[in-house]
Amino acid sequence: MSQLSSTLKRYTESSRYTDAPYAKPGYGTYTPSSYGANLAASFLEKEKLGFKPVSPTSFLPRPRTYGPSSILDCDRGRPLLRSDIIGSSKRSESQTRGNERPSGSGLNGGSGFSYGVSSNSLSYLPMNARDQGVTLSQKKSNSQSDLARDFSSLRTSDGYRTSDGYRTSEGFRIDPGNLGRSPMLARTRKELCALQGLYQAASRSEYLTDYLENYGRKGSAPQVLTQAPPPSRVPEVLSPTYRPSGRYTLWEKSKGQASGPSRSSSPGRDTMNSKSAQGLAGLRNLGNTCFMNSILQCLSNTRELRDYCLQRLYMRDLGHTSSAHTALMEEFAKLIQTIWTSSPNDVVSPSEFKTQIQRYAPRFMGYNQQDAQEFLRFLLDGLHNEVNRVAARPKASPETLDHLPDEEKGRQMWRKYLEREDSRIGDLFVGQLKSSLTCTDCGYCSTVFDPFWDLSLPIAKRGYPEVTLMDCMRLFTKEDILDGDEKPTCCRCRARKRCIKKFSVQRFPKILVLHLKRFSESRIRTSKLTTFVNFPLRDLDLREFASENTNHAVYNLYAVSNHSGTTMGGHYTAYCRSPVTGEWHTFNDSSVTPMSSSQVRTSDAYLLFYELASPPSRM
C-alpha cells in the first residue's frame, strides 16, 4: 500500500499534531487531503515533531455538497484514497496551499451539465410518439447500444428490400429517398415518429448520424445493426449505460465510409512519414469522458512513460507486489501502444481502459463529469501500485532522525520511502517537499519531508499587471504566519505559540505536474478563476524554491490539460508537444489538429506538465 502521506492522513494519525481524533468520512463525502492551514508530519516522523494544535480546533474546511445526494454526484470533490474504495492502495495527494474546493465543485468534464439537475429525468421521445403507443423501450437513460438496437427495430419486420426501394408485406412500396411523400401504413407512421424522437436524442452522435443519413439516402436501405460501435460524442444530457465488450477499436471519423483505420485527407498529412505521424490518434468520447481523454493524451506524450509502454518494459515489473492486480497497467499500456501505432486520422476507443480504471476507483463508474486532476491522481496511484518493485514492504522503523541536519534527514527519509514505494511511475512523477514550522518565541524549528505527485498552486488575485507562474510558485512557498485560532502548540514552550510555516522543494521530480487552483471558494458558492497565468514553454527555472543548492531544477513544458467552461459544466482538451517531432497539437477528444506554440498559453490552462530539461538547455 502506497505510503505517500496526505495532509489528512498526517492530521488523523499524528499524536503530536492532533489531540482529538478526526473521524474518517464515509464514501461519497468530501474531505480535504492536501496541505491546509497547518503543517503536518510524514508517516515516519509523526511521533517526532514538537507541535500539536489544541484539540477543539480544526483548520480544515468543512465539506459542502452541491446537487443531488447520490454517491456519484456527491463524490465529485477531492478524492480520499481509502482502502475500502480502491483496494489496499493509498498515497499522498498533491501538496497545496489554502482552502480546497468543496464536493461537486471540480472543473468537470463535458458540457451543459448543471449540478442539482438529474439527467435521468429527461425523455427523448416526443409526446406524440409516446401517445401513439410506440413500442420502443421507454427507458429514460439510453445507452448508445440501446439506441442502435431500437433504431434497428424501426425497420418493418415483415417487409423486404427490392431493387426499386423497400416494400412491406402488404405491397406498399416505400422509397427510402422520399419517405415523407410515399404511402405508408399507420405502423410506419408510428415508427417514423419514434425515429424522430431517437434522432433528437442521438443528434450529436456521429455514429447514429451516419446511420440516419444512410437510411434517408435514395436507392439504399438501412443495414441491420448487429453491434454498435463505441459512441463518439454522447450528448452531455444523456446518462448512457453503454458497456463495450471489445478491445481498442479504430473507428473512421469520415462519414459514409467503412469502419477501420484510415489516413486523413487534409493537406500535408499524407506527406508525413510514419514516424512523425505516430501518436496523433484521437480518443473517442464515451460520454462525459473528455477529462479522461485529456489526461491520457498528456501521459501519452510523456516521453519516458511512452517508452515504458511501447517497449513493454512494464512487463518485468508486474506482479512484484502481493496484489496480483495488473489489469490497469496492462490496459493503459495497450492503449498507449494503440495510439502510437495508429494513423493520424484514426480514433481509438478507450472503453476497456475505462472499465479497468473504474474497477480500481469506483468513483469513476458511469458517465458523470469528473475532475481531471483527481483522475490523474487515481490513475498514477493505480499504475504505481501495480508495477511497484517492492515485493514486501518493511514495517516503519521507530528510528528518530531529529538529530540529523536537514539535508541528511531529507536523504534518509527519501531512502525509507523507496524501501516501500519503488516503481517506474514514481521515478518519473514523485518529488519531495520540505515543510518547516518555527516557533516565534523560542525559535524551535521542526522540519518534515513528504513525497508529492503534483503541486497545487494558488493563483494571485486580480490587479497585478501580469500573473506569472513564478508568482504562483512564490505564493505557494511564501512564509505564512499561524496566529490566533491557527496557533499550534510548541512542545518546548508547552503552549500554543505564534509560528511561521514555510514550504520548499527538497527533491525535484523528472516530471513536474503543476495544478493551477482555478477555484475561489466562498460560503455562498464556488466560482472558477479565469485569470490568465503566463507560464514559460522553455527554461522554467525553479532553483529559487529549492531547499538546498541545486542546478537541476530547470523544466520545459510538453503538455497542458485545459478546462473551458464554468463550475457547473465545461469541456477538457489537451495541448501536447510530440516527443518525436517537437510539434504542438490540440487533442479535442477524437479531433487532433496541429497548432502553433504561441497558442499554448490560454486562461483555460489547468494542469501543466513539465519535464526536467537536459543540461544543454540550462545554459
UniProtKB/Swiss-Prot annotation:
Biological processes per GO annotation: circadian behavior; circadian regulation of gene expression; entrainment of circadian clock by photoperiod; locomotor rhythm; muscle organ development; negative regulation of calcium ion transport; negative regulation of transcription by RNA polymerase II; positive regulation of mitotic cell cycle
Q: Which residues form the active site?
A: 290, 571
Please list the residues that bind Zn(2+).
439, 442, 490, 493
Activity regulation description: Cleavage is inhibited by ubiquitin in a dosage-dependent manner. Cleavage is blocked by ubiquitin aldehyde.
Please describe the organ and tissue distribution of this protein's expression. Isoform 1: Expressed in heart, liver, kidney, pancreas and to a lower extent in skeletal muscle, brain and testis (at protein level). Expressed in testis, brain, heart and skeletal muscle. Not detected in the small intestine. Isoform 2: Expressed in the small intestine.
Alphabetically, the GO molecular function entries are:
cyclin binding; cysteine-type deubiquitinase activity; identical protein binding; metal ion binding; ubiquitin protein ligase binding
Location(s), subcellular: Cytoplasm; Cytoplasm, Perinuclear region
Specify the USP domain's residue ranges. Answer: 281-613
Q: Bias regions of kind Low complexity — which residues?
A: 259-269
Composition bias type Basic and acidic residues, residue spans: 90-100
- Where are the stretches annotated Disordered? 1-23, 54-112, 133-175, 221-275
Ranges for region Necessary for interaction with MDM4: 1-213, 417-517
Chain's role: Hydrolase that deubiquitinates polyubiquitinated target proteins such as MDM2, MDM4 and CCND1. Isoform 1 and isoform 2 possess both ubiquitin-specific peptidase and isopeptidase activities. Deubiquitinates MDM2 without reversing MDM2-mediated p53/TP53 ubiquitination and thus indirectly promotes p53/TP53 degradation and limits p53 activity. Has no deubiquitinase activity against p53/TP53. Prevents MDM2-mediated degradation of MDM4. Plays a role in the G1/S cell-cycle progression in normal and cancer cells. Plays a role in the regulation of myogenic differentiation of embryonic muscle cells.
What is the recorded name of this protein? Ubiquitin carboxyl-terminal hydrolase 2
Gene assigned in the entry? Usp2
